[in-house]
Amino acid sequence: MNQPAAQTVTGYFDSSALVKRYLVETGTLWVQTWCQNQNQTVAIAEIGLVEIAAAFAGKLRGAHITPVQYDSARADLAIDAQAEYVLVAVNRTVVDEAIELTSQHRLRGYDAVHLACALILNRALVARDLLPLVFVSADNDLLNAAAGEGLSTENPNSHI
């Protein structure tokens, strides 16, 4: 008897989580495993790519990575963003929801944007009878806000 195909699980990653795919940190193995799983998808706000690139540059300036590692990480991010990731555009609807979230939770500006993107994407998934997303971040305040909004959460730092 044929087994039904497994539904894809979407993980919405903020930059603090997805950067771990490219730089070795606590939680790197867990993030890399998620990204390699054929039944799991990675979603991120387009602005998250800028945040990740800035993290790479900061690591380079701090001499935590070499110029070769920096170039490789940037190139890999560009390839993955084009080929693998669901990129969530930041539009007026996202901005309005993010503004509202800042009044309800202890969030920095871009963290509110990430959460708004995830909530909007989650509503779209559920409306299509797809599995709700998992919100992935290494930021505890952001994870608490996401959980408060009803999202399932994962902290890659909890997976050593």
Regions found by a protein language model. Give the residues of each.
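Amphipathic alpha-helical segments within well-ordered protein domains
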Residues: S16, A53, A57, I99-T102
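Acidic, PIN/NYN-like endoribonuclease modules and their adjacent C-terminal/linker elements
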Residues: M1-T10, L121-I160
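Short glycine/serine- and small hydrophobic-enriched flexible loop segments
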Residues: A54-R61, L119-R123
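Aromatic- and histidine-enriched alpha-helix N-cap/loop-to-helix transition segments
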Residues: I44-V50, Y110-V113
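Helix-adjacent hinge/juxtasegments
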Residues: G58-T93
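Short, well-structured N-terminal submotif of metal-dependent ribonuclease cores
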Residues: M1-G48, K59-S72, L151, N157-I160
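Active-site neighborhoods of divalent-metal-dependent phosphate/nucleic-acid chemistry enzymes
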Residues: A83-D141
